[in-house]
């Protein structure tokens, strides 16, 4: 009975986690200049080996070489791992795991956990990090994003702090990783991550060229059940940059041409105006708990997350007359993914995961559009 309750709680937490990811995306468009603070490094009085790092919430002086680094979001975890570094502590959008340490990250941190080789201290959530655990950990550097902005001044008293905004904007992760790399003395690794990204985009463009030649127009949506929340991915976004780089023409509305927001809310009645799309990818998220997550291998862990998070959108799409009237639906070219995987990581590793699934959708003869 206790195990069942723990699984249900875990599922509820996952649903709320997705909400935080989406809200974090929407909040990233807010102006934050009024929150800027200049923070001195607490680690060294010497200025001989200091550098000033400009980030989206201020200017931070960092001296010496940070050894113990904590990250407060999936995005910054992606960037840290891409620099071939490991976290001493991690704060998720919301706790899926409530013990003091992530003892088995592959089963406790979605998508990125397989690459975490440490046992990071569980710092709670990015929007409300555990100041007690942070203080006890004594990090040399704290890295987070807009979700932690309300704690910026407090975090800066614990350790030099870098916070980033607009993670879903085109080109943003490349900017962020270079500045983080400067703070950590990993400039070469940052450039390598960017170079590898560009090579991967170019290789995928060649690999998918026959598919894109036949079906060039792609529509990407985010939704839970099509009724209250549905958004269209703007070409000027992290995903737009990937998909257009591969060769797709991203479908949008003419009225949204000058809208700079990466994700733009629309209504279900708007979908017929987007019917020129040859292919549709629906990023689903589930705000209500459904089937329980299963324990086991990480592959199964991530598969259960995908099934749970995409199922409401998938079911709603099948039952909705407007959605079914679209050409892509009639031709069985609608694919279901998760918002978490496609637009919650926003970094080099996240890009690899997007491209990996895109290949599965478009190249696998055995792909069943009913399975994420």
Where in this protein do the model-derived segments appear?
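Basic- and aromatic-lined ligand-binding clefts that recognize polyanionic substrates
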Residues: 70-71, 76-80, 192-253, 261
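Bacterial signal peptide processing site
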Residues: 26-29
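C-terminal motif of bacterial Sec signal peptides marking the signal peptidase cleavage site
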Residues: 21-24
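A short, structured surface patch at a secondary-structure boundary
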Residues: 77-130
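Structured C-terminal subdomain patch of bacterial secreted/periplasmic proteins
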Residues: 284-372
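Proline-aspartate-enriched helix->loop->beta-strand connector
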Residues: 131-143, 160, 271, 276-281
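Bacterial N-terminal signal peptides that target proteins for export
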Residues: 2-12
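Extracytoplasmic substrate-binding proteins
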Residues: 151-154, 159-228, 333, 340-372
């Amino acid at each position: 009975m206790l195990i069942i309750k723990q699984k249900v709680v875990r599922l509820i937490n996952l649903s709320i986690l997705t909400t935080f990811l989406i809200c974090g995306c929407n909040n990233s468009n807010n102006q934050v200049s009024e929150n800027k603070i200049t923070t001195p490094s607490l680690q060294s009085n010497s200025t001989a080996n200091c550098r000033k790092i400009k980030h989206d919430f201020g200017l931070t002086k960092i001296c010496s070489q940070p050894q113990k680094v904590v990250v407060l979001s999936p995005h910054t975890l992606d960037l840290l791992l891409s620099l071939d570094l490991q976290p001493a502590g991690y704060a998720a959008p919301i706790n899926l795991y409530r013990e003091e340490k992530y003892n088995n990250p592959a089963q406790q941190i979605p998508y990125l956990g397989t690459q975490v080789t440490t046992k990071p201290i569980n710092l709670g959530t990015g929007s409300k990090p555990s100041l007690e655990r942070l203080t006890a950990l004594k990090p040399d550097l704290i890295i987070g994003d807009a979700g932690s902005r309300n704690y910026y001044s407090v975090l800066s008293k614990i350790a030099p702090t870098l916070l980033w905004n607009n993670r879903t904007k085109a080109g943003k992760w490349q900017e962020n990783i270079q500045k983080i790399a400067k703070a950590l003395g990993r400039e070469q690794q940052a450039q390598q991550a960017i170079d590898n990204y560009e090579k991967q985009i170019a290789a995928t463009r060649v690999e998918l060229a026959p598919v894109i030649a036949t079906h060039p127009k792609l529509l990407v949506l985010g939704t839970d059940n099509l009724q209250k929340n549905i958004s269209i991915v703007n070409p000027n976004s992290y995903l737009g940059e990937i998909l257009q780089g591969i060769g797709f023409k991203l479908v949008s509305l003419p009225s949204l041409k000058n809208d700079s927001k990466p994700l733009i809310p629309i209504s279900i009645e708007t979908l017929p105006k987007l019917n020129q799309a040859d292919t549709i990818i629906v990023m689903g998220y589930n705000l209500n708990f459904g089937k329980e997550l299963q324990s086991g291998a990480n592959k199964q862990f991530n598969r259960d997350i995908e099934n749970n998070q995409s199922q409401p959108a998938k079911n709603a799409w099948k039952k909705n007359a407007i959605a079914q009237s679209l050409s892509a639906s009639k031709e069985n070219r609608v694919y279901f993914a998760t918002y978490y995987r496609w637009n919650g990581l926003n970094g080099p590793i996240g890009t690899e995961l997007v491209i990996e699934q895109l290949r599965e959708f478009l190249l696998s003869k055995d792909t069943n559009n009913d399975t994420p």
